From Swiss-Prot:
Biological processes per GO annotation: L-tryptophan biosynthetic process
SUPFAM superfamilies: Ribulose-phoshate binding barrel (SSF51366)
The protein's name: N-(5'-phosphoribosyl)anthranilate isomerase
Family of the protein in this entry: Belongs to the TrpF family.
One Pfam family recorded for the sequence: PRAI
Reactions mediated catalytically: N-(5-phospho-beta-D-ribosyl)anthranilate = 1-(2-carboxyphenylamino)-1-deoxy-D-ribulose 5-phosphate
């Protein structure tokens, strides 16, 4: 079954709604200066909400930040996963993070396919996941699903998370694409710039085929 990730959560209420809907991942942006960036107190409240929800893992999203900062926040917030969205050396982070912490590395499709494939091969058995997104990430731009399906079929051993332009209306189709094991949404479950509990529930249900 495909796992749903609700990202860009900015408060404990939205985190709790995502967990209650059955999201496997709840993500918060830890990159300074972004629209969805959370402060320290909000991050702690979100972490507490997710810790109380069995089956939901907390993800911190980072971009080109010092490893020391990422590792500190991983420890302080009890992050179950670290998501890297920049030009980071994923292997260096993997070597420093606890083995139990999932490392998600974002790649732009189709530009970074070779790099994604190289990580997949090098990271076997090391608790890592490829994420395919549009350039910039968080833009709501949809990838070329026909090209992605062809790539996934040609590399059947690669399982990945898909982001970019996902909504409750199209996630069921996205979940059926070859290689997709997780789907990542942010703006697609918002109304007026805020997370919408009904859209979150619909997204998770449609992703899982409920």
């Amino acid at each position: 079954m495909v796992v749903a990730k609700v990202c860009g959560v900015r408060d404990a209420g939205a985190a709790a709604a995502a967990a209650a809907a059955g999201a496997g991942f709840v993500g918060m942006v830890c990159v300074p200066g972004r629209r969805r960036t959370v402060g320290r107190e909000e991050a702690r409240a979100i972490a507490a909400a997710v810790r109380g929800a069995p089956g939901t893992r907390l993800v911190g999203v980072f971009q080109d930040q010092a490893p020391e900062e990422v590792l500190r926040l991983q420890r302080e917030l009890g992050l179950d996963a670290v998501q890297l969205h920049g030009a980071e050396d994923w292997a260096a982070f993997r070597a420093q993070l606890p083995a139990s912490t999932l490392l998600i590395k974002s790649f732009v499709f189709p530009r970074d396919c070779e790099a994604a494939l190289a990580m997949h091969r090098a990271a076997r058995g090391r608790n890592c996941m490829v994420l395919f997104d549009a350039a910039g990430g968080g833009s709501g731009a949809r990838l070329d699903w026909a090209a992605l399906a062809a790539w996934g079929a040609a590399h059947a051993d690669v399982q990945f998370m898909l982001a970019g332009g996902l909504t409750p209306a199209n996630v069921a189709e996205a979940a059926r694409l070859p290689g997709v094991v997780a789907v990542d949404v942010s703006s697609g479950v918002e109304t007026g710039g805020a997370k919408d509990g009904n859209k979150i529930r619909q997204f998770v249900e449609n992703a899982k085929g409920i």
